[in-house]
Amino acid sequence: MFTILKKIEDLTVTIVGLGVIGAAFAQSFKEIGIKTVYGIDIDEETLKKAEEKSIINKGFIETKEPLEKSDFVVITLYPNLMKSFFVNNIDNFKENAIITDVVGIKEKIIGDINPIMEKIRIQSGKNIDFIFGHPMAGREKRGIDFADSKVFKNANYIIIKDEKNKRENLELLSEIVKLMGFKKVSFLTAQEHDEIIAFTSQLTHAIAVSLVNSDSEKYDTNRFIGDSYRDLTRIAKINEDLWAELFMGNKKNLLEMIQQFEKELDIIKDALNNNDLGTLKEKFIMSTRRREKID
């Protein structure tokens, strides 16, 4: 463990994109002892804030200098910006650099990025290892002002399995995120990731959005809500740009999960129409047992 910790401490790290997640990564990296953390962002004010908060050593708008120095790069860009970022920086990555991302969809992103990574290897001969990852943590608000590394504590982290990745690099990433506070690290294929995320993340956001938007506003709803409504709708305060991309990028899986959810809702609706108390109780008992397994 001492060797791993020493290695992590001496890494030069760059965060690409200092929004709410990128800045939280930077903050967490400093907290676990990484000495040199750079930040890349298109917004000068964001870079200035990051430097003032001492979560990065230096901020950059231009990418070449920090990428050429970095052993470890975390890209926190929106999905539609990933491909162009790699095309524009194909020659800038350091030899033996480890790169990871935080994007919530994988099959599409990997399909975009892997050909570019292969081009880097062929053109430059550089040995670069891209390990696709997904921290299962976030906040409803956006921007560096709302970044907080505490969001990672006891959260789950998914690493995408790929035979091209070096085992020692996979172990290093896994160790880093555990030090950051992530409780469980899972290894999935891209397909497995997108299927389960369609259910546990994207469907839940779709339900929250639909619940809030289904309000007829006949009454002043805010005067009559309780914890159940607050808990169910917390994630309805949503980043429309990011989540529109995530939904569309995983459309097939999400549509399947919506249909599955609709079937369950129809069972409850039919039970009500048929005065079927037994079916209602069965569904309530089933959900209680399943939820208790999560706790």
Enumerate the language-model features and the residues they cover:
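NAD(P)+-binding Rossmann beta1-loop-alpha1 motif at the extreme N-terminus of oxidoreductases
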Residues: 2-68
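Residues at the starts of beta-strands that form the adenosine-phosphate
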Residues: 12, 35-36, 129, 156, ...
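Hydrophobic Val/Ile/Leu positions in short beta-strands of Rossmann-like dinucleotide-binding domains
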Residues: 13-15, 75, 159
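Rossmann-like NAD(P)-binding element
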Residues: 64-93, 97-100
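Short, well-ordered coil/turn residues at beta-beta hairpins
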Residues: 76-77, 102, 160, 202
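Rossmann-like NAD(P)(H) cofactor-binding subdomain of soluble oxidoreductases
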Residues: 88-145
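Internal alpha-helical scaffold of NAD(P)-dependent oxidoreductase catalytic cores
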Residues: 151-234
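Interdomain hinge/lid region at the active-site interface
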Residues: 218-287
